[in-house]
Amino acid sequence: DRSVSRGLGDVYKRQVLGNIREVSTQELKNDSYYMQGDYTGDLGVEKSYEAYLRGEKGQEVFLRNAYGRIKGRYENGAFDREAVPGKNLTLAIDMELQQYGEQLMQNKVGAIVAIEPSTGEILALVSSPTYKPSLLTGRERGSNYAQLFENPYKPLYDRAIMAAYPPGSTFKPTQGLIFLQEKAVTPYTTYPCHHGFYSSGVKVACHDHVSPISLVPAISTSCNAYFCYAFRAMIDNLDKYGTTGAAFEAWKKYIVDMGYGYRLGVDLPGESRGFIPNSDFYSKIYGANGWKGITVISVSIGQGEVLATPLQIANLAATIANRGYYFTPHVVRSVENTYLGDAVSYTHLRAHETL
């Protein structure tokens, strides 16, 4: 019996907790634990923590006579085994924050992720639109699933961890940290911005603000021009890196270290890795020596080929709050087994250093 405490919204039930379903023929072949008619986790925590939640099956061995009648326990029950209940999970989700996020996303398409920087615990995880989990139970499960699958708004799609979007201006703090680390700029380096960046026939528009501008106000005002200039100052520095490709690889390494381009390892199924291009990606398009900073300038402001999940973007904010490291985001705070009386701590305490 898998019980859930407190009243919960549909988003939380579907996206975080998930649901259970009858095991498939393939699962029966792959795992000797299951028997026909057993249930297993299908989505969310139910799937990720199935091995903890399902417990251990009990066993009773009986002695039968030649007519198949039970005569008693075999060897007085020496081979019997008591069932062990599954372990209880404690989640990190802040229910008030989760419910508030769900309210904000009603009738909208998108996602909300909130992370506690000091632990990596996910306090809220919202994807919209969603559906009622009860639709995927009972006799109508198959037809309901087909309708949800064909819905153009993709309610089955967990946008918080599966969707990949251009991170846009949320990417600029990352860029600023890289440029400082590589000494492409200082905190006092200024660049002009007259409603945008203009160079070699390329135009990247920007809004009206003071000019010239240095790094901190460039972040606070989200100046596109500043990051275009600074990006070129790093990528086109052949004296330091030798080639454009080498400079770009140095840039990419920082981005990956900050949690982009690969799965973060959240304890929920279906996480996307997003996309961070490497130098080979552009060399195949333009030739090894046919591109430079201006060619891929949209990358400098989180556009172009750069894609990130909402989880990765939220994790960057946690990394900055921690001044250069993050913990693997996770929704489960602890795992315990009240039957055995022990407590198993489930934590992601290894810090991932970035800068």
Spans of model-derived segments:
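Peptidoglycan glycan-strand catalytic modules in the bacterial/periplasmic cell-wall system
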Residues: 1, 6-9, 79-82, 86, ...
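Conserved, well-ordered alpha-helix/loop/beta-strand core segments that scaffold catalytic motifs
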Residues: 72-111
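Short, Φ-rich (hydrophobic/aromatic) sequence segments
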Residues: 31, 42-61, 66, 314-317, ...
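Short, solvent-exposed loop/turn elements at domain surfaces
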Residues: 24-27, 264
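Carboxylate/His-rich catalytic cores and anion/metal-binding grooves
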Residues: 43-63, 109-134
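Beta-lactam-recognizing serine transpeptidase/beta-lactamase-like catalytic domain environment
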Residues: 65-70, 74-78, 118-170, 174-353
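Single conserved hydrophobic/aromatic residue that forms the stacking wall/gate
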Residues: 2-12, 348-355
